[in-house]
Design a protein with these regions (language model features):
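Active-site-proximal loop/turn and secondary-structure-junction residues that shape catalytic pockets
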Residues: 95, 220-222, 279-281, 315-317, ...
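Right-handed parallel beta-helix
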Residues: 113-114, 151-160, 199-210, 222-236, ...
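Mature catalytic domains of secreted/periplasmic carbohydrate-active enzymes
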Residues: 122, 130-132, 202, 339, ...
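Extracellular "leader-to-stem" segments immediately downstream of a signal peptide or signal-anchor
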Residues: 2-7, 19-90, 95-108, 112-197, ...
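C-terminal structural cap/anchor segments
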Residues: 336-337, 343-402, 423
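A structural signal for leucine-rich repeat
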Residues: 370, 407-408, 432-435
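Short glycine/acidic-rich loop motifs that flank beta-strands on beta-rich extracellular proteins
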Residues: 86, 99-100, 120-122, 164-168, ...
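Hydrophobic h-region of N-terminal signal peptides that target proteins for export
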Residues: 11-19
Length: 451
């Protein structure tokens, strides 16, 4: 009897151990098979009350509801906050107008409900500084909100950063009418937010709208979270010169040589690309220490309105690895995954996964040469650009052109996979033979199985 009880007890223990093991969830993996850190699953908001003393700007001489440009007064509040050990600079209900502001280590920005930090519509109010633009380190105009070397920097809402871009957009399109070859940089415009050389950055529950140029730009940052943000710029009717035109180059989030970035629960509608991976451009870009790769980028549970590309790699990019776009809804996007291939830049896009998307778009996958403002130089050892290990799976969408891909002697495409896809496709251009070692499994286009 005792023996039977012992055996039963041992069997029960074995069952409990086995059941316990079954309950342990296997870690999620990046496309290259390495584990995704638990950090990427944590969308807990920063508790602003833990960030230090509140510095409500109107308590320090800043006028509310005033059209006066108060850059000097607002910067004085930021500087005082830093000098007194750090804290949170608060924009209360109402609005204040400013040029370029520079946050210091230990300072943070909160914009309260119905509060607005509004950018000046005069470029003279934005400082010329050494900064980063279009894959280059150069002198250009600072953003409205700037933070360099600010580990732990936090921007939180629910109020608004309003770039007030109307005058800049109109000037841009007038300039283009006068000189159709004018560059983006020649039309002098500030960005809304520029954060550089910073770790553990959080931008949460804030409206960031109407940027004159790129909306958010992060350079050489690590562990960045964009959580629940509303990012918007108009896509048409910004100028009587040409009512079809929208807010030019108003990219939602530009990640420039950044690692470990989560964009979660955000809404993006801009007149350019949404989430963009950058890192350098030019024939020698891979040799420049100011440039760098984008790695471990997760875009999850977002909603896209009209954008040029939901997830765009390039064009100013040298190496992007372990990039995931998942569980998003798309409405009226021009492209979903856009791999821009610059003939003048050595580029390597690898281990990218797009999955669990619904909605509608013009083109889903685009891989084409990109030659806007490019300057090829002679280089004997110029590497051949390549795209490899690109996975697209679990997609249900209506497309005008699901597969917008072209071959070139300037780049190589290999090891793509398409799995569990059900789409409508007016163009009907799906041709996996254009890609080396392309795997197709359970792909249905216009009701016709393709594998």
């Amino acid at each position: 009897m005792k023996t039977r009880l012992t055996a039963a007890f041992l069997m029960l223990m074995v069952c409990m151990v086995v059941m316990g093991k079954k309950q342990v969830k296997a870690p999620e993996l990046w496309p290259d098979g390495t584990p995704i850190a638990a950090w990427f699953a944590d969308t807990t908001r920063v508790d602003v009350s833990t960030l230090g003393k509140r510095y409500v700007v109107t308590d320090y001489g800043v006028k509310n509801y005033s059209e006066q440009v108060q850059t000097k007064e607002l910067q004085a509040v930021i500087d005082r906050c830093a000098q007194e050990g750090g804290g949170v600079v608060v924009i209360p209900r109402g609005f204040v107008v400013s040029g370029s502001l520079f946050f210091k280590p230990g300072t943070h920005l909160k914009i309260e409900e119905n509060g607005e930090l509004r950018g000046s519509d005069r470029i003279r109010d934005f400082q010329l500084v050494k900064t980063r633009m279009e894959g280059q380190t150069l002198n250009y105009f600072a953003a409205l909100v700037n933070a360099d070397g600010c580990d732990g920097f936090t921007i939180t809402g629910p109020g608004t950063i309003n770039g007030n871009g109307q005058a800049y957009w109109e000037e841009f399109w007038i300039r283009r009418q006068f000189n159709k070859d004018c560059t983006n940089l020649e039309a002098m415009r500030p960005r809304n937010v520029y954060i550089s050389h910073s770790k553990n950055v959080t931008v949460q529950d804030v409206r960031i709208i109407n940027s004159p140029f790129w909306t958010n730009h992060l350079y050489k940052c690590e562990k960045v979270r964009y959580l629940g943000c509303y990012i918007f710029a108009p896509t048409d009717n910004v100028t009587p010169v040409d009512p079809k035109q929208g807010a030019p180059s108003s990219d939602a989030i530009d990640l420039d040589a950044c690692q470990d970035v989560l964009v979660s629960g955000c809404y993006m509608n801009v007149c350019d690309d949404a989430v963009v991976l950058k890192g350098g451009k030019g024939t020698w870009a891979d040799k420049d220490p100011d440039n760098g790769p984008c790695e471990r980028i997760m875009v999850s549970d977002c909603t896209y309105g009209k954008v040029h590309g939901c997830l765009t790699l390039g064009s100013e990019s040298i190496h992007d690895r372990n990039v995931v776009l998942r569980r998003c809804h798309v409405h009226n996007a021009n492209r979903v995954l856009w791999l821009k291939m610059r003939p003048d830049t050595p580029q390597h896009y690898e281990y990218v996964r797009v999955e669990e998307l619904t909605g509608d778009c013009a083109s889903f996958l685009v891989v084409r040469p990109w030659t806007q403002f490019f300057k090829p130089e002679d280089r004997a050892d110029m590497p051949l650009s390549k795209c490899n290990n690109i996975m697209i799976r679990n997609i249900q969408m209506d497309c005008s052109n699901f597969f917008n891909v072209g071959k070139s002697d300037k780049f190589r495409m290999t090891d793509f996979s398409f799995e569990n896809i059900k789409v409508s496709d007016k163009k009907q251009a799906f041709n996996p033979s254009l890609i080396e070692n392309c795997q197709v499994k359970n792909v249905v286009i216009n009701g016709e199985k393709k594998d």
